[in-house]
C-alpha cells in the first residue's frame, strides 16, 4: 500500500456533509489533511442568522472529530471583485449568469488553490461530485460523478488542466445516500445537515431582494411577440428565458388557458416578451454562439468537434457539432433546443468526460438571432 502520509491535501470545508466526508475519507486514507473554511460573503440569511458563523462552527466540530487542523480564510474581496461584480454586470446586460461556474474558476480553484499552496499542499480537495482520471503522461481528464443526479462537472467546466492537476474529488465515485451513511456511521456533526442551495456562497436569500439592493429595477411593458400589451414587468433582470412563474398573467388573455412563459427580452426598449405554451416558437433555437470557450486539456486553436452538450444543470445531454475558433464557438444542435439562455454555460462532453465549455452569448433560430437580450 502506498504511503500517503507525506502527501498534504488541503480540503475546502463549507460546513456541509459533502466536504465533511471528503475530509474524513482522505484522513482515513492516511493523507496529511488540513481543513480550510472560506468566508466569501459578509451577510446574514433571511432570518437574521449569520450563516458563515454557523457553518464555521460545524467545520470546527467535524475537524475536531476526525482530528485534523483547520483554518478560516477570508476571500470576501476576491469574491466581490471576481464573481459578484461579474454577476451584477451580466444582469445589467440582460443576461442570466451562472455564478457557480465563475466561483469555482476564480475562488475555489484559484484563490483557495493559491492559498493552499502557501500551506505546502500537494493537492486541494472539495466535496464536488466529479472524478479525475490521470493518464500515464500526466494529463488529467475530468469525468462525471457516478451519481448522475448530483454530478457537478457542469459547474467545474471552466477549470484548467493546471487546476485539475492539483485537484482531488474523493466523492466522485459515491452516490449521495452513501455519503450521508458514511457521515452518520462516523458520527459527524454535519451528518443530518440539509444540502445548501442558492447562489454559490451567498446561499438562500430572496433573490429579488438581493438584486434590488445592488441594481435599480426598471419596470417596463410586457408584450406578446405580435404586439399585444400584457401589463407591466418589474424589471428585465428578474426574468429568465423560459420562465413560467411570476408573470402575473393567466390564461384569461386570449382564447385558451395555456400557461404563459417569458419568450424574449428587448433591453434597448425595456420590453419583456411573453407567449403561451411550453414549446412556444420563440423559445426554440437551432444553434448558439459562445465566448470564453475553454477546454480542460490542450486542444488546437481551431477545430470541429462532434460531442454532446448541456445548456443547463441536470439537463440530459444533447448531440451537437461545435466549431471552435480561439475562445469562441458556434454550437449547432442535432435537435432544436428550448430556452437557450444568454449568460448560462454550455458544457461539452465526450461520453463520461467533461471537455470544457463556454458562456452562451446568443441563440439562433435557423440563422436568425433570438431576441433574448
UniProtKB/Swiss-Prot annotation:
Domain of life: Bacteria
Localisation per UniProt entry: Cytoplasm
EC code(s) of this entry: 2.8.1.13
Catalytic reaction equation(s): S-sulfanyl-L-cysteinyl-[protein] + uridine(34) in tRNA + AH2 + ATP = 2-thiouridine(34) in tRNA + L-cysteinyl-[protein] + A + AMP + diphosphate + H(+)
Annotated site residues (Interaction with tRNA) in this chain: 128, 344
InterPro entries: MnmA-like (IPR004506), MnmA-like_C (IPR046885), MnmA-like_central (IPR046884), MnmA-like_central_sf (IPR023382), Rossmann-like_a/b/a_fold (IPR014729)
Chief localization: cytoplasm
Residue span of region Interaction with target base in tRNA: 98-100
Function: Catalyzes the 2-thiolation of uridine at the wobble position (U34) of tRNA, leading to the formation of s(2)U34.
Protein family: Belongs to the MnmA/TRMU family.
Protein name, per record: tRNA-specific 2-thiouridylase MnmA
Protein source organism: Streptococcus pneumoniae (strain Hungary19A-6)
Gene: mnmA
Amino acid at each position: 500500500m502506498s504511503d500517503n502520509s507525506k502527501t498534504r491535501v488541503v480540503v475546502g470545508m463549507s460546513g456541509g456533509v459533502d466536504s465533511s466526508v471528503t475530509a474524513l475519507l482522505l484522513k482515513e486514507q492516511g493523507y496529511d489533511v488540513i481543513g480550510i473554511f472560506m468566508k466569501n460573503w459578509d451577510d446574514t440569511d433571511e432570518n437574521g442568522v449569520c450563516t458563515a458563523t454557523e457553518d464555521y462552527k460545524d467545520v470546527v466540530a467535524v475537524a475536531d472529530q476526525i482530528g485534523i487542523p483547520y483554518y478560516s480564510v477570508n476571500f470576501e474581496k476576491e469574491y466581490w471583485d471576481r464573481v459578484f461584480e461579474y454577476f451584477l454586470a451580466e444582469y445589467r446586460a440582460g443576461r442570466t449568469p451562472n455564478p457557480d461556474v465563475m466561483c469555482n474558476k476564480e475562488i475555489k480553484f484559484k484563490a483557495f488553490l493559491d492559498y493552499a499552496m502557501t500551506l505546502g499542499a500537494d493537492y486541494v480537495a472539495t466535496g464536488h461530485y466529479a472524478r479525475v482520471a490521470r493518464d500515464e503522461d500526466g494529463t488529467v481528464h475530468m469525468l462525471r460523478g457516478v451519481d448522475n443526479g448530483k454530478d457537478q462537472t457542469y459547474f467545474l467546466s471552466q477549470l484548467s488542466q493546471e487546476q485539475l492537476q492539483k485537484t482531488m474529488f474523493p466523492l466522485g465515485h459515491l452516490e449521495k445516500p452513501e455519503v450521508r451513511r458514511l457521515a452518520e456511521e462516523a458520527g459527524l456533526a454535519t451528518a443530518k445537515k440539509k444540502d445548501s442551495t442558492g447562489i454559490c456562497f451567498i446561499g438562500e436569500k430572496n433573490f429579488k431582494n438581493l438584486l434590488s439592493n445592488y441594481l435599480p429595477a426598471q419596470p417596463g411593458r410586457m408584450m406578446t411577440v405580435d404586439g399585444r400589451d400584457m401589463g407591466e414587468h418589474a424589471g428585465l433582470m428578474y426574468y429568465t428565458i423560459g420562465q413560467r412563474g411570476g408573470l402575473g398573467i393567466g390564461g384569461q388573455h386570449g382564447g385558451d388557458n395555456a400557461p404563459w412563459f417569458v419568450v424574449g427580452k428587448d433591453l434597448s426598449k425595456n420590453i419583456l416578451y411573453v407567449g403561451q405554451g411550453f414549446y412556444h416558437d420563440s423559445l426554440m433555437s437551432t444553434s448558439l454562439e459562445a465566448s470564453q470557450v475553454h477546454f480542460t486539456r490542450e486542444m488546437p486553436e481551431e477545430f470541429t468537434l462532434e460531442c454532446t452538450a448541456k445548456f443547463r444543470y441536470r439537463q440530459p445531454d444533447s448531440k451537437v457539432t461545435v466549431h471552435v475558433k480561439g475562445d469562441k464557438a458556434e454550437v449547432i444542435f442535432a435537435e432544436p433546443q428550448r430556452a437557450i439562455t444568454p449568460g448560462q454555460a454550455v458544457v461539452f462532453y465526450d461520453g463520461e468526460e467533461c471537455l470544457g465549455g463556454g458562456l452562451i452569448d446568443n441563440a439562433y433560430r435557423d440563422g436568425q438571432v433570438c431576441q433574448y437580450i
